[in-house]
Amino acid sequence: WALENEPEMEKVWFADKEKLLAILRLYMGVGAKRRRKDFMYAKQIFELISFFFDGESGERDEFRLADDEVKAILNDYLAAYDHNDDNSMWFNKLKEIADKNGYASDMKAYKANPENFKGNVSDIAEAVRIAVTGRANTPDLWTIVHIMGEEQMTERIKKHIK
């Protein structure tokens, strides 16, 4: 499909076959409890994964937080980020960023008293997710960052801090 319909992008998409396979496993749910069955044709898949490839441009979701909030969160994220952290350690750092910036790291506390917080840790994750992928909804962000690589992730976040 790619060679016939997107010949200029085929070389980009298939340049690193292991990366492409990791992306497809993530998006198709290979090895997961439930596999995706909603893709009707290849173009849908490549539209969803286009953000992995530099030079790809597409529609970006808007940040729901104010610009100064986003910049503070992204600066804290880059300062705390360690590519060697496992998913649990990484998420705990997101919780620390939430606490530092006035967001709830504990969803029970947030649900009990939402007025005490600017938002919750999911707002922190969403800001990072949009900066990295351009989308508010994606599969597991930690996995995306590890497939993408630290350098590409950092470059994308720094674009939003300027």
Model-inferred region functions:
Residues 1-162:
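Conserved nucleotide- and phosphate/pyrophosphate-binding catalytic cores
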